[in-house]
């Protein structure tokens, strides 16, 4: 679970994992890229008067990689807009400064892992996983997952841009209040 808090500040995004030496360099780079995205989207004419913090709650081991940077962006946008995120969707994806969602490793394991958790708790037909569009060609999901998707009990969504994920998680277009 990723959480974010925001307030007035100087455009800084504090990576708590890095500060306490639990975040590796690739994860830290991903958080810095989020700052670039936010500045490009919200501070093209004026400074970004924002201070934000990001953390993986109850994580006590090392965090490495950038496959959660889309999730971190969604957590930040939720905190900024004071809008809740859908909790029945998981998300994975790397992000560049322009909002393009980039491929990640282990896509099958990530989809199947969330599916198994949902199946153990009871499929509702609303649950699903959001993955990078560039990873669709890598999908080789287990028959149990394919059957649930075909039956409308679980979904796998692909996104090419952060705005596509905003649509799914907030049920509105990017930029709408």
Language model region names:
Residues 3-22, 26-177:
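Peripheral, non-AAA+ core regions of ATP-driven protein-machinery
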């Amino acid at each position: 679970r990723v959480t974010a808090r925001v307030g007035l500040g100087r455009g800084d995004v504090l990576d708590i994992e890095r500060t306490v030496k639990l975040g590796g360099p690739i994860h830290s780079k991903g958080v810095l890229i989020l700052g670039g995205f936010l500045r490009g989207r919200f501070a093209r004419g004026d400074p970004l008067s924002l201070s934000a913090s990001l953390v993986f709650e109850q994580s006590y081991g090392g965090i490495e990689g950038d496959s959660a940077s889309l999730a971190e962006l969604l957590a930040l946008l939720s905190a900024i807009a004071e809008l809740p995120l859908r909790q029945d969707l998981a998300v994975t994806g790397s992000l560049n400064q322009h909002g393009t969602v980039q491929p990640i490793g282990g896509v099958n394991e990530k989809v199947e892992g969330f599916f198994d958790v949902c199946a153990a708790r009871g499929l509702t037909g609303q649950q699903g996983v959001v993955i990078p569009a560039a990873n669709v060609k890598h999908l080789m999901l287990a028959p149990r997952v394919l059957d649930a998707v075909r039956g409308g009990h679980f979904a796998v969504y692909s996104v090419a841009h952060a705005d596509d994920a905003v649509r799914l998680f907030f049920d509105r277009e990017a930029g709408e209040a």
